[in-house]
Each structure stands twice: as structure tokens, then as C-alpha cells.
Amino acid sequence: ERIKGKALQLAFFYRNFLREYKVFIFDHKEHINENYEISDMVEEIAYCIKKLNIDKVDVVGVSQGGMIAQLLAIDYPDIVDKLVLVATTSRNNPTTNKVIDRWIVLAENGKLQELQKNMIETVYSKGYIAKNKWLSILVQILFKPKLDQLDRFIVLARSCLKFDIFDKLDKIQAKTLVIGAALDQVIPVEFSNELAKKINCQKLIFEKSGHAVHQEVSDFNRTVLNFLKSSD
């Protein structure tokens, strides 16, 4: 889902940050080729940060955004001050690859409703789905990609399958918090544990949440903000 035209929704979701921060939310560029990779996304964000004349940023990355954030901190250590990595991994793995491969197949075959259903069941925990009966209806309303957007989705999904920077994690200099979810079906919590151990940083695991931990946990943004405001 693209972020253009969603300023009000995003401002509401990130309202806790607005008194302390100027918040920038990045989308991928309009035209991407089939070889588009995480490293390309990192270069684009670094370019934007420099063009905005920003010296230092605190970066919060969720899922694929967490992959981008890791590599940004590695390749541009002078830019990143603090880093929050949410429901993400430093390398592909059989569980994640199986989930993403399934999404790609459904997208390639234009099975949008089945893709929506599978994503809801995989991204959110069963408990959260049970408590929020409106979730599937909301996703059907908001997630209505055109065929060219499905092609885009496939390219972005495939970029995760090729991602592996585990051996570079010791280059991260930024103060880092890793947030994982015990019920994550997309990126198992063991990879959050692995990430925190390799970086040698703080870790927080939410025991009752799924991959969409940033949506499921009511005080998630406050937790992140407290870390970002904490003194070194």
C-alpha cells in the first residue's frame, strides 16, 4: 500500500512522536525494475536525508523497513544516531521465504482475495484477529492494488528473499533496540533474538503479538519513543 494521500492516517498513527520529532515516512520510488534490491532502497533514503540537509536521524524500521534500516546504519553510520528494528531479520530463512513465496505466487496469479486473507492470517496473531472482527473488511477497503501494483509488490517481496547482511551487523554503531514478537509467523522471534545478540543491543519481545506488533500493541509507539529519548 502506497503512502501518498494518507497524511491524516499517518499523522494520527505517529502522533506520539510529533511533539518530540519531525517525522519522515519514506515510500519506494514510483518506477522500480525487477532487480530492485534492499541496497537500492538504502541508497535512495540516504540521498533523501542528505537532500533534506539532515545531519542525524533516529530510524525506526518495521519488517522490510527494518532490513533497510540495518543496512542504512551499516553503510551510513554518520547519519544514524539511534536505531529501532521491529519484527525484522538480517538474513532470509526458510520460514520467511516460504511465506513470501506464497504471497508472490498468489500475486502472480492475480488471486487478490486469497492474498489478502493469507496476509491477514499470517501477519496478525490469532488473538488480535479474534478481537478485531473488522480487520478483514478494513484490509479489503484499503488494500486494492491495480495489476501494476501487484507487479510492484512481487518485486519488493523478492528483494527480501535475497537479503543477507548477518556478517556485517557488527558494523552497526548506532544505539539499537530490537523488538520482536513471539507469535510472529513471518519472521520467527528467533531471528529477533539472533539480531540483538549479534548487534549486542537492547531487546524487547512481546509475547502475545504477531508480525504486526507495531499495530497490535497499544503502547508500542510510546515504548519506541521512550527508547529514542533515553540518554546514552
Question: Could you say what each language-model-derived stretch is?
Answer:
Residues 209-221:
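Catalytic histidine-centered segment of alpha/beta-hydrolase-like enzymes
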